[in-house]
């Protein structure tokens, strides 16, 4: 551990302007709306807004496992969110204020439920459908340990 006690973290972290590189706008360290754009909504109860990235694919695979297991309430519409700036649209930021994919909206609840971050979506769906999530506390702890591990690990 450093013995330098002179460093004081800033009260508010500020992002230094991007360097203009090719990928500088897709994963900026800020979030929030940059433009107005509504998101499409399909006919199924679950609306998935994502892209075929490792985190996006996790949710799609789980939804397909639910459907293969006969959980018809897991029908969903998938919408492509290109990470070229679309994730900063007003519609997407309303669902995920962090401006990251994936995000899910469940229209079966009294008010639509928004869920963002792949691990949160996986846990939400597992609990909603009582699928692949043990009820036994020890087994559940083991399951959640692996879920959280994969979230923090590189693909």
Regions found by a protein language model. Name each.
Residues 1-155:
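GST-like domain detector, emphasizing the conserved glutathione-binding G-site
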